[in-house]
Amino acid sequence: MKMKSIILAVTLLLVSATLVGAAEKSKTLVAVFSRADENYGVGTVEKGNTRVLAEMIAEQTGAELFEIRAAKPYPKEYSAATDVAKAEQNAKARPALAEDKDISGYDTIFLGYPIWWGDLPMAVYTFLEAHDWSGKTVIPFCTHEGSGLSGTENTLRRTLKGSKVLKSLVMRGTTAQNSRDEARKSVASWLRGLGF
């Protein structure tokens, strides 16, 4: 009888510790801006290059996925979309978003975006400037076609006051879109390096 009581007590202790640990586990969000339709280097796609990476990250971490979208969609044709995006960048515009996401309940946020002329898309700035990033861990990931990170990691450190910005994943959009196995392995390796 005494042995049963000890086993029951140990079991209850382990269950309690597990429940407390689960309650204390940080909430993670993958917030991504990506553009489908006609894209440079990959043709017309159903999912934008950065969205492809975002889904891999969400799948491998169990994080929730949120897509940052401009209220007014970009044109489907590549050169028309770049004309609009370049005009937004030149004006330092902050386009309205289709919807927003309350990030207050998240401790860790993976932030994905394509590099457009060496910078974040302007809709990403709209999202960033709408929130308090104090105490958040931000993990950037981006796609590009030759410009790499373009200093956007430093831009995020300046913009997201009070947050901790970790090492970015940087990948060519053509790799994300056309070499999914390679992309998935790169994402997994990067996440392991971050402790996920």
Give residue ranges: language-model regions.
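Bacterial N-terminal signal peptides
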Residues: 9-17
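Hydrophobic/aromatic beta-strand patches that form the interior of the parallel beta-sheet core
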Residues: 31, 66, 110, 139-141, ...
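Bacterial N-terminal signal peptides that target proteins for export
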Residues: 1-8
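Glycine-rich phosphate/pyrophosphate-binding loop and the adjoining helix
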Residues: 164-196
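Solvent-exposed loop/turn segments at secondary-structure junctions
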Residues: 35-38, 70-75, 115-119, 144-149, ...
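Helix-loop-strand module that forms the ligand-binding subsite of alpha/beta enzymes
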Residues: 76-162
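N-terminal beta1-alpha1-beta2 submodule of the flavodoxin-like/Rossmannoid cofactor-binding fold
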Residues: 21-108, 118, 185-196
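Extracytoplasmic metal-acquisition and chelation regions
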Residues: 28-29, 151-174
